[in-house]
Amino acid sequence: METTTLPAREWANEKQHLADTLQIVRSERQKLENDLGIVDGNDRLIQVLDDGSTDAEVQQFVIRNKLRSLHQLRLSSRQPYFARLDFMPDPGAPVLGHLKAGEKSSIYLGRWGVLETPSYQVRVADWRSPVANLYYSGQIGRVSYEAPDGRVEGELSLKRMFTISDGQLEDMQDTGLAGQEKYLTDALSQMTSARLREVVTTIQAEQNTVIRFDAFSPLCVQG
């Protein structure tokens, strides 16, 4: 259901990027399933989880983390991300990870991060990462966000929002504030459950500020 007026070339590029991302998600999921013994049965996994020895406690911690990652990858196979940012940090900016100062990068945001092993390249950035502030609070043009090593300033040239369902790209739109309001309205109208299942895709600037507020400082919310 291609309802936006973006060029066909953009649709083709985004569909290919989605297909490549889903292939990475499937590959990472398969590695975890094989590592956990899920493909060949759960006997070894259950035996370790039931063992009460000290060594087993360490293994249990590792296994539970892997199970959590596996659960996230399974959900990501239906919707790996919901937005894209094109951002160029200023030269000398204290950026981390896959961003490079002075170079424009496309950043895809999802409910969870997706790393491609063994290179550990960031394919999808977690919505809680510092750079995701640009999606919730930034407008096209000069922007900044707080990173662990200091403030990162630069140029935001694109904010694109996606509707992806069961691994299929259904809609996308490039947006500033007005477009984001429309996306919020459309997303909420499609919620058939009383529970907002995809709330991270519809957070607005003021809500984002509250979510990221220092947990050890007082905060008063009115209304």
Language-model features: where?
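Walker A (P-loop) ATP-phosphate-binding motif of ABC ATPase nucleotide-binding domains
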Residues: 218
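Hydrophobic anchor at the beta1->P-loop junction of P-loop NTPases
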Residues: 221-222
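Extended, charged low-complexity regulatory segments
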Residues: 1-200, 204, 208-213
